Amino acid sequence: MEAGLEHLSRGTGKHVARLVAVLEPYYRSMETARNVAALANELGIADVVVVANKVRDNADRSAIAEFCRAHEMRLVGEVPYDGQLADVERRGAAPIDAAPGSPAVVAIEALAGPLASDAPMQVRE
């Protein structure tokens, strides 16, 4: 689904087992993820997890981890910032096909299985 709250407010979350909120290390993005997580909880989605995207350095990592702790959000993974993906996106190609060994694609592949599984996910500190 596309980013935003409108999908949840339309009732599309009725049969959702796990909601993944993706946030970037920017205040507005983190606040949006917090709002998504809160709405998901209100709608009865019990398993809400957070994945950090476009993480550049330890400052980004720390800011995201601190925000998630402060708002009781379960941070379960991160995808590093990867300049290759901007080039791939401009070409309209799929990152997994056009840049299969890139750091971001490798991180996404590592997260895909656990995110799709019914098993509980380990929270990152």
Where are the model-predicted features located?
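C-terminal accessory "lid"/substrate-recognition subdomains
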Residues: 54-58, 62-81, 103-125
